[in-house]
A protein has these predicted regions:
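A nucleotide- and high-energy phosphate-metabolite-utilizing enzyme signature
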Residues: 1-272
Length: 272
């Protein structure tokens, strides 16, 4: 810009912002995907671009439990792959080697309580909150929390469970006897079902929604996109809601059994 020089940090901040716009801007051809930059050190108030040393200093001094969970999904997808691998190596001790005690478990419970409060504010009434595929009771986020909160404390000495893919991680947790075969089957089946529901909801107008329609016709249309059909016994929407409640109910029961606030939970006993 007119021969002016800028710092490397400022250069990469601007570059990241432009890439984010290019990926998430909605055009006549749609968009690539939505980008959320809030999952970075200091959140929305933090720098967009950090040096590797900057990341390491932050994680060693101020890293939080939720960031340990989030980093389980980290993977280099573009640019300098060698630098990406160095980042993963740097982050590994922060994820797996720090203690995961009852305080950390309470922080995970706090994450869930925060989600529940936000849902209560956005969607009044227990019935409406239950219709949120991602954040509602027994939804996608509870499955992910189950997986990630087991991976962090046990992944240090059991590298077999360090899987980024949720379905593969569930199988690995089963193989290491951290969840039962029945729990693995229940959670895997629910995860596939709920992700399918999420996709069918969002394919309409590329909407970023996770809530089941309230309107009866829209709910029926969603059920039919999922393959449900009316029969002599029940309508497509009724069949879909029955399966939805079964899956989410089973997930929530497993979540509460492992991490529930009532002590002693199954997980709290294992980390004492």
């Amino acid at each position: 810009e007119g021969g002016a020089t800028i710092s490397a940090s400022e250069y990469f901040r601007r570059l990241c912002q432009k890439i984010t716009v290019a990926l998430s801007e909605f055009t006549s051809e749609g968009y690539v995907y939505r980008v959320d930059l809030r999952l970075r050190p200091e959140g929305a108030a933090g720098n967009i671009a950090y040096s590797l040393d900057g990341f390491e200093r932050y994680y060693q001094s101020r890293g939080e439990t939720w960031e340990r969970l989030a980093l389980l999904k980290a993977w280099p997808v573009a640019g300098d792959r060698a630098l990406g691998r160095r980042f993963l190596e740097m982050a590994r001790p922060f994820i797996y080697d720090q203690p995961f005690d009852l305080k950390a478990l309470e922080e995970v419970r706090g994450i869930k309580r925060k989600i529940d409060r936000r849902m209560s504010t956005k969607q009044q009434g227990r019935g409406q909150r239950a219709r949120n595929v991602k954040l509602g009771a027994g939804g996608i986020r509870e499955i992910e929390l189950i997986v990630q909160t087991l991976q962090v404390p046990y992944g240090g000495r059991t590298p077999q469970i360090r899987e980024r893919n949720t379905m593969k991680a569930l199988g690995a947790l089963r193989d290491q006897s951290l969840i039962s075969a029945e729990e693995c089957e229940t959670l895997s089946s629910a995860y596939v079902f709920l992700r399918d529901v999420e996709n069918k909801l969002q394919m309409v107008d590329d909407a970023q929604t996770h809530s089941l329609p309230i309107d009866g016709q829209e709910l029926t249309a969603c059920a039919r996109r999922l393959g449900y059909v009316d029969n002599e016994l029940s309508a497509a929407a009724e069949q879909f809601l029955r399966d939805y409640r079964r899956h989410t109910g089973q997930v929530n029961r497993i979540f509460e059994d492992i991490f529930g606030a009532s002590e002693p939970s199954r997980f709290s006993q294992s980390i004492r």
